Design a protein with these regions (language model features):
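Hydrophobic anchor residue at the start of the ABC signature
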Residues: 9
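ABC ATPase nucleotide-binding domain "signature motif"
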Residues: 1-6, 46
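Helical segment within the ABC ATPase nucleotide-binding domain
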Residues: 34-49
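Conserved catalytic segment of ABC-fold P-loop ATPases
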Residues: 64-71
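Catalytic Walker B motif of ABC-type/P-loop ATPase nucleotide-binding domains
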Residues: 20-23
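Conserved H-loop
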Residues: 49-55
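Conserved beta-strand-loop-alpha-helix hinge in the C-terminal portion
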Residues: 74-104
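Conserved signature/switch motifs of ABC ATPase nucleotide-binding domains
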Residues: 15
Length: 121
Protein backbone atom coordinates (compact mmCIF):
# COMPACT_ATOMS: atom_id res chain seq x y z
CA UNK A 1 0.00 0.00 0.00
CA UNK A 2 2.81 2.41 0.84
CA UNK A 3 4.42 2.14 -2.60
CA UNK A 4 1.10 2.79 -4.35
CA UNK A 5 0.43 5.80 -2.13
CA UNK A 6 3.95 7.11 -2.80
CA UNK A 7 3.48 6.81 -6.56
CA UNK A 8 0.03 8.45 -6.44
CA UNK A 9 1.32 11.42 -4.43
CA UNK A 10 4.34 11.87 -6.68
CA UNK A 11 2.08 11.81 -9.77
CA UNK A 12 -0.27 14.35 -8.20
CA UNK A 13 2.57 16.76 -7.46
CA UNK A 14 3.94 16.54 -10.99
CA UNK A 15 0.55 17.10 -12.69
CA UNK A 16 -0.05 20.36 -14.50
CA UNK A 17 -2.70 21.80 -12.17
CA UNK A 18 -1.96 25.01 -10.26
CA UNK A 19 -3.56 23.91 -6.98
CA UNK A 20 -3.44 20.46 -5.45
CA UNK A 21 -5.74 19.28 -2.65
CA UNK A 22 -4.27 16.62 -0.38
CA UNK A 23 -6.84 15.31 2.10
CA UNK A 24 -5.19 13.16 4.80
CA UNK A 25 -2.70 11.67 2.29
CA UNK A 26 -0.71 9.77 4.93
CA UNK A 27 -3.59 8.47 7.05
CA UNK A 28 -3.34 4.83 5.88
CA UNK A 29 0.45 4.59 6.14
CA UNK A 30 2.73 3.30 8.87
CA UNK A 31 5.10 5.75 10.61
CA UNK A 32 8.23 4.68 8.70
CA UNK A 33 6.56 4.93 5.29
CA UNK A 34 5.08 8.32 6.29
CA UNK A 35 8.51 9.66 7.18
CA UNK A 36 10.07 8.50 3.91
CA UNK A 37 7.16 9.79 1.85
CA UNK A 38 7.08 13.10 3.74
CA UNK A 39 10.70 13.78 2.80
CA UNK A 40 10.12 12.80 -0.84
CA UNK A 41 7.01 14.97 -1.12
CA UNK A 42 8.90 17.93 0.36
CA UNK A 43 11.67 17.53 -2.25
CA UNK A 44 9.17 17.38 -5.11
CA UNK A 45 7.24 20.35 -3.70
CA UNK A 46 10.42 22.43 -3.39
CA UNK A 47 11.11 21.76 -7.08
CA UNK A 48 7.58 22.42 -8.38
CA UNK A 49 6.45 25.14 -5.90
CA UNK A 50 2.82 24.15 -6.45
CA UNK A 51 0.10 25.51 -4.22
CA UNK A 52 -1.05 22.64 -2.01
CA UNK A 53 -4.04 22.66 0.31
CA UNK A 54 -3.06 20.00 2.82
CA UNK A 55 -5.88 18.77 5.07
CA UNK A 56 -4.68 16.86 8.13
CA UNK A 57 -5.40 16.17 11.78
CA UNK A 58 -1.65 15.82 12.40
CA UNK A 59 -0.09 18.97 13.83
CA UNK A 60 3.36 17.62 12.94
CA UNK A 61 2.38 17.21 9.27
CA UNK A 62 0.84 20.69 9.24
CA UNK A 63 4.00 22.32 10.61
CA UNK A 64 6.25 20.24 8.36
CA UNK A 65 4.46 21.08 5.11
CA UNK A 66 2.70 24.35 5.78
CA UNK A 67 3.46 27.95 5.02
CA UNK A 68 0.53 28.65 7.31
CA UNK A 69 -1.78 26.52 9.43
CA UNK A 70 -5.49 27.21 9.58
CA UNK A 71 -6.99 26.07 12.88
CA UNK A 72 -10.63 25.15 12.50
CA UNK A 73 -13.22 25.30 15.26
CA UNK A 74 -15.49 22.44 16.18
CA UNK A 75 -18.73 24.22 17.03
CA UNK A 76 -19.74 26.42 15.48
CA UNK A 77 -17.47 25.49 12.61
CA UNK A 78 -15.14 28.04 11.12
CA UNK A 79 -11.63 29.38 11.15
CA UNK A 80 -10.34 30.10 14.66
CA UNK A 81 -6.83 31.23 13.82
CA UNK A 82 -4.33 31.35 10.96
CA UNK A 83 -0.78 30.72 12.14
CA UNK A 84 2.08 31.57 9.75
CA UNK A 85 4.83 28.95 9.58
CA UNK A 86 8.15 30.71 9.03
CA UNK A 87 10.58 27.84 9.51
CA UNK A 88 13.41 27.36 7.03
CA UNK A 89 13.38 24.44 4.61
CA UNK A 90 14.22 21.67 4.66
CA UNK A 91 12.48 21.38 8.01
CA UNK A 92 13.81 19.28 10.83
CA UNK A 93 11.08 17.86 13.07
CA UNK A 94 13.47 17.67 16.01
CA UNK A 95 14.66 21.29 15.79
CA UNK A 96 13.89 23.58 18.72
CA UNK A 97 11.80 25.93 16.56
CA UNK A 98 9.75 23.09 15.08
CA UNK A 99 9.06 21.55 18.49
CA UNK A 100 8.06 24.93 19.97
CA UNK A 101 5.69 25.74 17.11
CA UNK A 102 4.11 22.28 17.28
CA UNK A 103 3.58 22.77 21.04
CA UNK A 104 2.00 26.20 20.47
CA UNK A 105 -0.46 24.76 17.94
CA UNK A 106 -1.32 21.84 20.20
CA UNK A 107 -2.03 24.31 23.02
CA UNK A 108 -4.38 26.30 20.76
CA UNK A 109 -6.18 23.12 19.72
CA UNK A 110 -6.53 22.01 23.33
CA UNK A 111 -8.14 25.35 24.23
CA UNK A 112 -10.65 24.87 21.42
CA UNK A 113 -11.52 21.34 22.58
CA UNK A 114 -11.86 22.49 26.20
CA UNK A 115 -14.14 25.35 25.13
CA UNK A 116 -16.41 22.98 23.23
CA UNK A 117 -16.45 20.48 26.12
CA UNK A 118 -17.40 23.27 28.54
CA UNK A 119 -20.25 24.41 26.28
CA UNK A 120 -21.54 20.84 25.98
CA UNK A 121 -21.17 20.12 29.66
Amino acid sequence: RGMRQRAALARALTMDSQVLLMDEPFSALDKQTKNILRDEIEKIWMETKKTVVFVTHSVEEAVFFGTSVVLMGVYPGGIRKIVPIELERPRQIDSKEFVELRAELLKLLRKEVEKVAKQAG
